[in-house]
Amino acid sequence: MKVLVDTPVWSLALRKQSKTEADERAVKELTELVRESRVVMIGPIRQEILSGISDEGKFETLRQKLRAFDGEVLTTEHFELAASLSNRCRRQGIQGSHTDFLLCAVSVKGNHPIFTLDKDFDRYRGYVGIELYQERNGAE
């Protein structure tokens, strides 16, 4: 099964500074998913990852590396579902970003779990029917 990987996981993996033990486990899990060719990406996540890289050489290198990952084709239905999911959560007093709900819509339509470190998705889950990816124990 393909897994949608959210920006915070990618950001963690791309950071050079030291990481906590939990961070290291998340990076190790992402590495395994990449090795298994199970990562799927949406354009807005790709954009978030690439935004803010001022060095053109680093930008181009990362852009080329990210091209290895399947890009989910977004349709009108994805955007409409994202709006519907956002509205459903707002009625419950839960707010989130457009990208978060687009990720939820792609997850629901494609039956892809979401690998994220963002705790907001725990709140969305109760109202939008997404599955959150759980790290495997001892991912090698």
Question: What residue spans do the PLM features occupy?
Answer:
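Short, well-structured N-terminal submotif of metal-dependent ribonuclease cores
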Residues: 1-41, 51-63, 138-140
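A secondary-structure boundary/capping signal
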Residues: 6-7, 45, 117
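Generic structural signal for small/hydrophobic residues in well-ordered secondary structure
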Residues: 6-7, 49, 82, 107
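A generic structural signal for short hydrophobic patches within well-formed alpha-helices
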Residues: 10, 46-49, 121-122
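Active-site neighborhoods of divalent-metal-dependent phosphate/nucleic-acid chemistry enzymes
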Residues: 20, 70-115
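A general structural signal for well-ordered alpha-helical segments in protein cores
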Residues: 27, 42, 46, 59-62, ...
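Structured helix-beta-strand junction loops
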Residues: 35-37, 65-69, 92, 110, ...
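Acidic, PIN/NYN-like endoribonuclease modules and their adjacent C-terminal/linker elements
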Residues: 104, 108-140
